[in-house]
Design a protein with these regions (language model features):
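FAD-site-proximal beta/loop scaffold in flavoenzymes
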Residues: 2-35, 129-193, 204
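Rossmann-like NAD(P)H-binding beta-loop-alpha module
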Residues: 22-72
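Cofactor-binding loop segments of dinucleotide-utilizing enzymes, especially the Rossmann-like FAD-
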Residues: 44, 79-81, 177
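Generic recognition of short, well-ordered alpha-helical segments
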Residues: 52-56, 87-88, 186
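A Rossmann-like FAD-binding core segment of flavoenzymes
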Residues: 63-155
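Acidic, glycine-rich loop-and-strand cores that form catalytic or ligand-binding grooves
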Residues: 197
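C-terminal, flexible cofactor-proximal segment of oxidoreductases
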Residues: 202-208
Length: 208
């Protein structure tokens, strides 16, 4: 979903969307930025797991840079025109990290045309941004088990909202991030609520 980005690029521009070595790698790259350097963040397009996640990450990186590299800059090249809890995040950034974070929506940057991983350059219609460290989170989709089960329609799995069963197979229940659950965000709270709906339905089916 991001031209020029690939699985091989993860070592240079970690997505760090899973815990463990990717997160450690990203932290190391941020700490090793030159003084006054630039960090570039590319969030994923909708829908994706944990809508506030990329912006929480930016906040954490800004906190780290404020202590270790206060003249550094963070540029967010967002594929979305707006994001979750935007007003709160932008007010917090202005209060705690004034002048450090610049959020650019697609109308401003015109879209990412290419990423040169070797030179750490992000080409957009607006400009070419050179990063000293970067995190790219590409578009997401349901896991391979959903594809293997044949309950997906494209990248995600349509469900019957009354009981969370898959529209493609009522004997299979799809919960959480993989499901297309109307306006419910792909969050832990949503998954927990959906699990209770599915469990109650299954219990009803078993007990009559």
């Amino acid at each position: 979903s991001v031209p020029g980005y690939s699985a091989e690029a993860q070592s240079m521009m970690p997505h760090a969307w899973t815990s463990g070595t990717q997160v450690q790698l990203l932290r190391s790259k941020v700490l090793n930025m030159k003084k006054g350097g630039t960090f570039v963040m590319v969030p994923p397009p909708n829908p994706y797991r944990c809508p506030p996640g990329p912006y929480e990450r930016v906040s954490m990186i800004a906190h780290l840079l404020k202590e270790r590299n206060p003249t550094a800059k963070i540029i967010i090249l967002d594929p979305k025109a707006k994001f979750s809890k935007q007003g709160l995040f932008m007010a917090g950034w202005e209060k705690h990290y004034p002048g450090m974070i610049e959020w650019l929506d697609p109308d401003t940057h015109g879209g990412i045309k290419n990423i040169n991983v070797a030179t750490m350059e992000f080409e957009t219609d607006l400009d070419t941004f050179k990063a000293d460290a970067a995190s790219v989170v590409p578009a997401q989709r349901a896991g391979s088990i959903a594809m293997a089960a044949g309950v997906n329609d494209g990248d995600w799995c349509p469900i019957n909202p009354a009981n969370m069963s898959a529209k493609a197979d009522s004997n299979i229940y799809v919960l959480g991030d993989a499901s297309v659950a109307s306006a419910m965000p792909k969050s832990g709270f949503s998954a927990n609520s959906q699990a209770k709906v599915a469990a109650n339905h299954i219990r009803g089916e078993l007990t009559g």
